[in-house]
Amino acid sequence: MPRSLKKGPFIDDHLLKKVETQNDKGTKNVIKTWSRRSTIIPEMLGHTIAVHDGRKHVPVFVTEAMVGHKLGEFALTRTFKGHEKDDRKSRRR
């Protein structure tokens, strides 16, 4: 169930402050955050936000197509190594 429109998008206050101060100064430094739950808003366009994936911070460059999505959608937490091959050549006897 999506969030109610009357509430507006959720974004952590500390992340919003960092974005606003960089917009006021006109700088585009990397913003490091653990807030995967924050929604991407138009004020974040052009910024690089390093989102924590549980192990390291993944740099995410915010584009116009990302507005409305969550930051955590762009920093994957699981790595798929692939299934074991199932043919006779790869089996050990």
From Swiss-Prot:
Keyword Amino-acid biosynthesis: no
Protein name listed in UniProt: Small ribosomal subunit protein uS19
GO MF term set: rRNA binding; structural constituent of ribosome
NCBIfam families reported in the protein's UniProt record: rpsS_bact (TIGR01050)
Family designation: Belongs to the universal ribosomal protein uS19 family.
Keywords, in A-Z order: Ribonucleoprotein, Ribosomal protein, RNA-binding, rRNA-binding
Annotated GO biological process: ribosomal small subunit assembly; translation
Role noted for this protein: Protein S19 forms a complex with S13 that binds strongly to the 16S ribosomal RNA.
SUPFAM superfamilies noted in UniProt: Ribosomal protein S19
A single cellular component GO annotation: small ribosomal subunit
InterPro entries the UniProt entry points to: Ribosomal_uS19, Ribosomal_uS19_bac-type, Ribosomal_uS19_CS, Ribosomal_uS19_SF
Database matches in Pfam families: Ribosomal_S19
Domain of life: Bacteria
Species in which this protein is naturally found: Salinispora tropica (strain ATCC BAA-916 / DSM 44818 / JCM 13857 / NBRC 105044 / CNB-440)
Name of the gene encoding the protein in the UniProt record: rpsS
Record's keyword annotation contains Coiled coil: no
